[in-house]
Regions:
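C-terminal structural segments of small proteins and small subunits
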Residues: 78-118
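Short, low-order "capping/linker" segments at domain edges
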Residues: 110-139
Length: 141
């Protein structure tokens, strides 16, 4: 994971929030930050059980997610522009749903105006196998 505390965050026009019910919010928050940190800038603070994901893989940031843990809830606050909001909901949510497939995690986003965003999970073993095969096909394996 890289620390982005010194980098200025751009201002994004759209917001979306997901509250993921789980007995282990800190475990999933830390896992999400560590996994996503291979390709984007992330942080995770064990003491405060908070973190961030900055979607800056291709240079300028296209969105950011703030992670926070509460009693049996992992809360995700996504900020992005119109062009990237739905895709970043999907990318963030599907990773989390995949990590928590055995627990049946569901990530349902609610947009700032109160309208539903995208939903990821719960994932079945068949879903996971299909996703694995699709990923391998994209990577040319």
């Amino acid at each position: 994971m890289t620390n982005s505390a010194d980098s200025a965050q751009p201002v994004f026009s759209r917001r979306s929030t997901a509250r993921v019910s789980t007995d282990r919010p800190s475990r999933y928050g830390k896992q999400l930050a560590a996994h996503m940190g291979r390709k984007i800038t992330t942080t995770w603070d064990e003491a405060s059980q908070t973190g961030s994901l900055t979607f800056d893989r291709e240079g300028a940031a296209t969105g950011a997610v703030e992670l926070s843990c509460h009693d049996d809830i992992l809360q995700l606050h996504l900020a992005a522009d119109d062009a990237h909001l739905e895709r970043l909901e999907q990318v963030t949510g599907i990773h989390l749903a995949r990590f928590g497939a055995k627990e049946g995690l569901v990530v349902s986003w609610i947009r700032q105006e109160g309208t539903p965003g995208t939903t990821q999970g719960p994932l079945t073993p068949e879903d996971l196998e299909r996703m694995r095969a699709e990923r391998e096909a994209r990577q040319g394996k």
